[in-house]
UniProtKB/Swiss-Prot annotation:
It comes from Pelodictyon phaeoclathratiforme (strain DSM 5477 / BU-1). This is Arginine--tRNA ligase. It is found in: Cytoplasm. It holds the Pfam family Arg_tRNA_synt_N. NCBIfam families: argS. Its EC number is 6.1.1.19.
Length: 552
């Protein structure tokens, strides 16, 4: 809908002789008394035009030319905002389009022909998924859904960290528990994984092999079994939340030599060395980030010979370019904030265009139960497990609570609130709006034979002119722009806020506008408006990955 205004305003600027390099920004006022749409272009352009913003706004209005029956009123407000009020006819004609488009309403083609890769979760297979990892998983899944709505060919990838020191520690942890099961006395290291699941994996190995592995010093046997069992558990947990991946990239491939005998990690070192950004000192290999203005260089290969996280991350991103992805999206936890800029700098040095890399950092999660905050530590074995949360509140509440706050904000997951069957629970509130409409339509079919698929009757919508009807209709028109905003910001929370506002509009409409008791044509028109609302709720729920119950 915002694209409806931009060319008209641009033409008005041109015909009025107003030259500006400022972008035409169209906003949707939260309070509809300030219009259905608004622009601050007069405020932005006033300084370079050396004119009073309100006077400039009035000049722009005088040169606006909209199609007939679309704009009811245009006014200058405040310091120089231009507010636009849509006609009831235009609003309801647009609602007709919602019904005609159905599941396709809100989708676009801005990404048509483009390949996008969204990487998310990518948890080390060292233990069951924690609640913190779950937030990133839901965020990534929703972001991938948003890209898909705009025509991108989306690949959902899990970076499978099956190499590195943590996996070695995992194997050692299982081996120690296995030796204990064999009857040996072991001083279990405090630095290793303590959870009960380690003992359960060791028990499986003992059941399969007895004491035959007791003399083996090959940690890989234990690591491999642990990796298989834990990753199967991770995938099962993700499936419970409706989180899927199309591709699993194994980190060990970056350590595997190609036909020429060179690993992906080594190619990065060689390429950076050629650019004179590599040095060896203190027994380690360093990325010379001091040449980029940073205070310290960053280690790529430790003195132990083990790569730091930065090196395989750089090599991994190069594979994304090599696979032809024009849009690269990474969903990370807050623990990646310090590391990731170095990865981008390395890619720039090596000649890769990083403008098409988007990063979504999600902050930490704490879980509150009866006012008590739970602690999380996979290593110590007292992790706050994602499976337990799903068992407690369900998949829908888990997903929606993870994204109902900005990804940039710390999230306090209130378990008791998530289980409430009242309007205080945002999940219940949204789903109840959908269920309420479904119940209404069942009654309408029984009492007046209403057919929600009857396209020839859609013109009846144009008879709706009350404030509650127009507010709901106008809210439905905001949906396509809200998808684009959520995608641009990589912020599904915006979609949650929009759907909550839409549900509020519907509940107000339901209270103020009698439906089945209205005169026949008005009743059918209001029912069509309800069907359109149900459609937009469903479309939004599909992006967020939550169910749309027909009864509650």
């Amino acid at each position: 809908m915002k694209e409806f205004f931009r060319p008209v305003i641009s033409n008005a600027l041109h015909s009025a002789g107003i030259t500006t390099d400022k972008q035409i920004i169209i906003e949707q006022p939260a309070d509809k008394k300030f219009g259905d749409f608004s622009t601050n272009i007069a405020l932005l352009a006033a300084k370079e035009c050396r004119r009073n913003p309100r006077e400039l706004a009035q000049t722009i209005i005088e040169h606006l030319s909209f199609p007939p029956d679309t704009i009811a009123k245009i006014e200058v407000a405040g310091a120089g905002f231009i507010n636009f009020y849509l006609t009831p006819l235009f609003i309801m004609q647009s609602v007709e389009q919602v019904l005609l488009d159905g599941d396709e309403y809100g989708k676009g083609e801005s990404g048509k022909g483009e390949k996008a890769i969204v990487e998310y979760v990518s948890a080390n297979p060292t233990g069951p998924l924690t609640i913190g990892r779950g937030r990133g998983g839901v965020l990534g899944d929703c972001i991938a859904n948003l890209f898909a709505t705009q025509g991108y060919a989306v690949t959902r990838e899990y970076y499978f960290n099956d190499a590195g020191r943590q996996m070695q520690i995992l194997g050692e942890s299982v081996r120690f528990r296995y030796l204990e099961r064999c009857g040996e006395t072991i001083e279990f290291p405090a630095t290793h994984y303590q959870g009960e699941y380690i003992g359960e994996i060791a028990e499986e190995l003992f059941n399969d092999h007895g004491t035959a592995l007791a003399d083996s010093t090959d940690v890989q046997i234990f690591k491999k079994r642990a990796e298989e069992i834990i990753f199967a558990s991770i995938r099962k947990t993700l499936e419970r939340l409706g989180i899927r991946h199309d591709s699993f990239f194994n980190e060990h491939t970056l350590y595997t030599p190609d036909a020429g005998g060179v690993t992906g990690n080594q190619r990065v070192i060689d390429a950076l060395r050629e650019k004179e950004f590599i040095a060896e000192y203190d027994g380690a290999t360093w990325f010379l980030t001091t040449k980029l203005g940073q205070e310290k260089d960053k280690v790529l290969i430790k003195s132990s010979g083990e790569p730091s996280y930065r090196l395989p991350d750089i090599a991994y991103h190069i594979t994304k370019y090599e696979r032809g992805f024009g849009m690269i999206v990474n969903v990370f936890g807050a623990d990646h904030i310090d590391e990731y800029p170095d990865v981008l700098e390395a890619l720039k040095i090596l000649g890769y265009d990083t403008r098409h890399i988007k990063i979504a950092i999600n902050q930490f999660v704490t879980t509150t139960v009866d006012g008590q905050t739970l602690k999380m530590s996979t290593r110590k074995g007292n992790a706050d497990l994602l499976d337990d949360l799903i068992d407690d509140v369900g998949a829908d509440a888990t997903r929606l609570f993870f994204i109902m706050r900005s990804k940039d904000s710390h999230l306090n997951f209130d378990v008791e609130l998530a289980k409430k069957q009242s309007k205080d629970n945002p999940v219940f509130y949204l789903q109840y709006a959908h269920a309420r409409i479904c119940s209404l339509l069942r009654m309408a079919q029984q009492e007046i034979g209403f057919d929600a698929t009857s396209s020839p009757e859609l013109h009846l919508l144009q008879r709706l002119t009350s404030p509650a009807e127009l507010q709901l209709g106008s809210a439905l028109l905001d949906y396509p722009d809200m998808i684009k905003t959520s995608l641009r910001l990589l912020e599904p929370q915006k979609m949650v806020e929009y759907l909550h506002s839409l549900a509020e509009c519907f509940h107000r409409f339901y209270q103020e506008c009698p439906i089945l008791k209205a005169e026949p044509d008005i009743a059918r028109a209001r029912l069509f408006l309800s069907v359109a609302t149900r459609q937009v709720l469903r479309n939004g729920f599909r992006i967020l990955g939550v169910s749309a119950p027909e009864s509650m």
